[in-house]
Amino acid sequence: MLFILIFSVMESLPTELAYHVLSFIDFNSVVTYRLCSQESNNFIKSMLVFFPINFNNLVDQSTNYFEFVEKVDLQFCRQITDEFLSSFCRVKIINLRGCDKITDSGLKHLQHVKEINLAGCYQITNDGLLGLNNITFIDVSYCPKITFKGFANFNDDSVAVVQTRPLEYPKSKPYTLVDKKKINIRYYNNHPFLGKNNHAFQKDTNQSHSKNSISYLPRIIIAPKKIIDKIETERCRLFDSIYAVKPEFRDRVFMKNYEDLLPNTHLYDKQSALNRLYKKSNRRKFIDNLLSNKMDIMIGGSIGLFCTHKRCNFEPNDMDLYLKYIDSEKIRKIESIIYQSFIFRSIVVIRTSITITWLIQSTTDEITSIQLNIMNIKSWAEVFITYHADLTCIGYEILTNKFVYLDNRWNNILQNDTNYFSNILNMESANSIYKAASKYQQRGFTCVSLNDLCTDIQGNIAKSYDHHIYDSLVSLLSDKIYNKLNIHTSDTGYQNYYQKKYTNTNLIHYIFDKYRMSENISFASSVSHLQLPKIYPDIIMLSVYKINEILDTQQNNNTGTEFHQLSIHKQKNYINKTEKFFYSARSGAQYTGINHYNKLHTVCIVCKCGCDSFMTMNDFIGCQYEYSLDRGICSRIQCREYEYLELFLV
């Protein structure tokens, strides 16, 4: 066998070079070669002082091959349990980041460990740490059951990484005394081995890039004013109609069954549409697992269009997921299903203001993107009314096994050959809408933008597009009020998105190209690491939208007045507290630009202890959401009790 020949050659190599070659060989081949002879067994044992395990389907049955290991990387091996760790009696350095099935019982097998990463092992408690008597470095980020009491048996001057800050953690002291021992508390992991692929991966995205220029995109027609006014009015009326209906009835009234449009020469029949949806086996397995877990999810975006419309000249490598009544447990369940459904080389999880995206790199280097929208929605109609164009207002509802669409939007494309893109009901800049229209123009559809890129702050037509000039009302407001530019709420399209294969090296380039102009973005190793607030918010972002007068008096639930999905529950009694913040910015918000909007909706966070302290969006737009809540507020407010409030500028 070829791998036996490879190992035979390796035995003659210097140790350092043999280590390097071994890192490119899969785990099963290593184990198989060990069983060939006594000599091969001895060679592998000598090499297994450290061996990287970089796949996610490692299970407890593989426990007999690690008795000589002293340094091991098991991060993201989600299937291993406490039993698996019983073989690591000699290990001194171990990375268990994201191994969330590990409990205190498993740590009893690691008596000789000196350096360990337990980030995301949320079942670990103080009792488990008390048995680790030789610790010099530990990462317990996102382990909510651990406090300082768990550090009592650590060595003096040990380093403890605690990226999520419990109530008792100090505000700024680098050292803390625990049972007369000096513990070095850190909020980041820079360990040369245990810190690789750490929770945050940030790059400066403030610089302009030539590929972001409009000149790189196919020319899109700008609609005349008469058409713009007509379509804006129609979409705003539909928006008002949807939000005038109680949430539990919205889908029944506004969502229609795709099969009602059949037969149609432009559309596939249902079975053909399902065949296109299930074309990839891993996608089918993922959808089947969502169904077996009874997840009330709709798959929207471009994949719905690909499955149903015959004009599509593309095959998406992504899935956009929408989940009703979202909460942190449902998010964790989705991530668990992802790990069950895909065999992958690596996963990068990216958090923006309204999405969590899993970039899944398979063992053949193919990229699959699963993007979960984390807006707190109650109906699919709320999702589709915010879409840029009618073109993508169709999706697959998993529980009912149906393709569904928003009436008076997606069915329009069967009568009208032209697809109009707008930013009426969201905060996208005209630049972003132009790029979205360009993407679908490349995909074989006729697209027209309702937003003129070449407009300055006063509304005058500019001779050419300049990215330094405000291109929308949102850019103006975000700069005047928050001193932030290029704030995006969703991914914008670049021509180089759609390569199908990426190596380990250029995967990072893919990510950076995709998100480079977005400031409000964070990278996390696992959703289980994201500390979501007790009262789960709808969304945290700057949003300009129309508030329906009907909803000011209509009580739809016991929490108060319901607003558009880009909102936080209204808390009128706190508005006076933050008036001083908005006083200086009020003059900059007088210009509304679009007559459909009559209020600016924004949000801040206030302390509930009565100290009148608060943190505005100015402090955490563009920051990592989960860190800013814990670190930003706690650096100023003594307690961790906080809540969200809604503020308006009229």
Swiss-Prot record:
Every F-box domain range: 7-53
Cross-referenced InterPro entries: F-box_dom (IPR001810), F-box_LRR-repeat (IPR050648), LRR_dom_sf (IPR032675)
PROSITE patterns assigned: FBOX
Name of the molecule in the record: Putative F-box protein R757
Organism encoding this protein: Acanthamoeba polyphaga mimivirus
Phylogenetic placement of the source organism: Viruses, Varidnaviria, Bamfordvirae, Nucleocytoviricota, Megaviricetes
